């Protein structure tokens, strides 16, 4: 007897029910994922859509081009204007002085090394001798009356000044004014003559090595000194230290100054004021060096044509003697008092190869 077949239809019916439920779940998940994707895409695309809409609105409706540089510049706020820092004004009454030798400026390498050494020592003013009492100029001057005065060995003065400035130092040109035995032989009108003669007045017997001097009353001599000052100023030396602004120490009545001039302090004062004013107008500073004894003397000094107070010096450097006198402190006190009485603005005291403010 055969076994009756099992009815599997009901089982098939249940399978279809379960299958339908799975499809519903999967469909719901798919719709949810699609909705989320739409939101994500919309979120990401929103800036571009807004930009496009804005651009369309302004270009089509308003007639403006947002992509043009002028429009972009107009839409950006102007940057705030910064106030420039004020340029510091150098104080001419601060810092120590050092007197350098020409050998320290014979090459660019030595210039840089010399500047570095003075910088490490805390020096501010570095004095370079560019014209001394021998009459020689230690730079290649182009002045016509300097044709015989340029020394055999010179330095590049402009490069020396630049090297010092790069190190934060102030270059100072040391110049001797009227004690000059060379220039008179180039232009005889510049020298002091004996009264009513064509012979040069000499500061000693010729056999003893007597030398001529430049005449403070000679227009040619005064212009020559002014030319040297102007020349070194143009090379970068804003500070000038001038010595030898005087008459010969042993001048006598036999000296015949140009134009019948006499050895007076008022004439030297006029020259100093003229040079100082010219320098100041061009941003320069003039210092004048005189020996201790000349400044300290209460009596008229022949070389000055009067007393120190008559000269009207604004910035003074007192040169101490090589041999220290017994009454040095007394003389220095008197010199400082004379400078104060004369209303000298700044005073320094030079000893050997350095100087300090007082």
Residue ranges of model-derived segments:
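N-terminal Lys/Arg-rich, disordered targeting/topogenic segments
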Residues: 1-27
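Active-site-adjacent "subsite" loops/lids of carbohydrate-active enzymes
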Residues: 88-99, 178-230
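Hydrophobic membrane-insertion alpha-helices, especially the h-region
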Residues: 27-47
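Aromatic-lined substrate-binding rim segments of carbohydrate-active enzymes
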Residues: 132-176, 250-285
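Aromatic-lined carbohydrate-recognition surfaces of secreted/lumenal glycan-active proteins
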Residues: 170-180, 240-243, 262-302, 319, ...
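Substrate-binding cleft of secreted/luminal carbohydrate-active enzymes
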Residues: 41, 45-54, 305-358
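Catalytic domains of carbohydrate-active enzymes, especially glycoside hydrolases
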Residues: 110-136, 231-243, 308-317
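N-terminal, intrinsically disordered, polar/charged segments of Gram-positive cell-envelope systems
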Residues: 50-94
């Amino acid at each position: 007897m055969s076994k009756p077949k099992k009815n599997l239809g009901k089982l098939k019916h249940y399978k279809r029910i379960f299958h339908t439920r799975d499809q519903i779940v999967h469909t719901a998940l798919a719709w949810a994922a699609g909705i989320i994707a739409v939101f994500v895409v919309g979120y990401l695309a929103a800036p571009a859509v807004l930009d496009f809409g804005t651009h369309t609105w302004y270009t089509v409706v308003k007639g403006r081009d947002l992509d043009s540089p002028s429009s972009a510049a107009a839409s950006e706020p102007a940057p705030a204007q910064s106030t420039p820092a004020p340029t510091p004004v150098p104080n001419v009454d601060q810092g120590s002085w050092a007197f350098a030798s020409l050998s320290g400026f014979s090459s660019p390498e030595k210039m840089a090394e010399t500047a570095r050494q003075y910088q490490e020592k805390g020096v501010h003013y570095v004095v370079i001798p560019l014209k001394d009492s021998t009459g020689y100029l230690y730079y290649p001057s182009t002045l016509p009356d300097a044709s015989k005065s340029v020394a055999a060995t010179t330095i590049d003065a402009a490069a020396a000044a630049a090297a010092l400035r790069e190190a934060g130092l102030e270059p100072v040109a040391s110049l001797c004014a009227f004690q000059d035995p060379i220039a008179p032989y180039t232009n005889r009108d510049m020298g002091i003559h004996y009264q009513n003669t064509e012979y040069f007045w000499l500061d000693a017997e010729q056999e003893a090595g007597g030398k001529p001097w430049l005449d403070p009353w000679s227009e040619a001599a005064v212009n020559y000194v002014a030319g040297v000052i102007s020349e070194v100023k143009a090379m970068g030396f804003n500070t000038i230290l001038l010595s030898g602004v005087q008459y010969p120490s042993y001048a006598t009545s036999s000296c015949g100054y140009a134009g019948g001039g006499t050895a007076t302090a008022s004439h030297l004062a006029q020259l100093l004021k003229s040079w100082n004013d010219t320098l100041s107008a061009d941003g320069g500073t003039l210092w004048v060096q005189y020996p201790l004894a000349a400044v300290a003397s209460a009596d008229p000094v022949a070389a000055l044509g009067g007393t120190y107070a008559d000269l009207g010096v604004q910035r003074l450097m007192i040169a101490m003697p090589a041999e220290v006198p017994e009454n040095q402190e007394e003389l220095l006190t008197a010199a400082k008092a004379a400078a104060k009485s004369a209303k000298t603005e700044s005073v320094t005291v030079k000893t050997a190869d350095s100087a300090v403010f007082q």
